[in-house]
């Protein structure tokens, strides 16, 4: 039995293409892998606090007493990291906003990236500590950006996930959604076909 963690990060709730596609993934995965356990975390509905000068102090090893706000941030960071490490498959629904990931997803990464916990520095360079996982990124875009200079989502997510130790990453693209109903329907259809292929593998 595998454990699957689905991270939603769209601000558009049910209208979101990435949310709809991640829901489709959950339906298909549940049908094909009925014994697996699926956890869904909606980072827009339940937002992660923005990392600031006070909160960053909670995430660095120190003997200094923590403020109540820092204690909350550290506890949340511990919870998010434990959840991430406890799952085998990580599904990230990542809409493109202004060429990059959403603020909601970035805030999550900022609390998950902790030296000595999810990565460490060695004499050979950084080493990821969140290993043995597979990641599936479902990314929706209004325009066409794949493989072009305006796609900052794909390289950023590949780099971040690899940095913490997740190197088996597959991407599902839904592009051209803003180009009209026909293109949006084709984008959904193509993305669902890609999801079907991943689920069946």
UniProtKB/Swiss-Prot annotation:
Cofactor comment: Binds 1 FMN per subunit.
Name listed for the protein in its UniProt record: FMN-dependent NADH:quinone oxidoreductase
Origin superkingdom: Bacteria
Organism, scientific name: Shigella flexneri
The protein's Enzyme Commission number: 1.6.5.-, 1.7.1.17
Database matches in Pfam families: Flavodoxin_2
Assembly and interaction partners: Homodimer.
SUPFAM superfamilies, alphabetized: Flavoproteins
Catalysed transformations (reactions): 2 a quinone + NADH + H(+) = 2 a 1,4-benzosemiquinone + NAD(+); N,N-dimethyl-1,4-phenylenediamine + anthranilate + 2 NAD(+) = 2-(4-dimethylaminophenyl)diazenylbenzoate + 2 NADH + 2 H(+)
Family classification: Belongs to the azoreductase type 1 family.
Keywords: Flavoprotein, FMN, NAD, Oxidoreductase
Cofactors demanded by this protein: FMN
Record-listed FMN binding positions: 10, 16-18, 96-99, 140-143
Its job: Quinone reductase that provides resistance to thiol-specific stress caused by electrophilic quinones.
Higher taxonomy: Bacteria, Pseudomonadati, Pseudomonadota, Gammaproteobacteria, Enterobacterales
A GO term, aspect molecular function: oxidoreductase activity, acting on NAD(P)H as acceptor
Gene3D superfamilies (alphabetical): 3.40.50.360
Coiled-coil ranges from the UniProt annotation: none
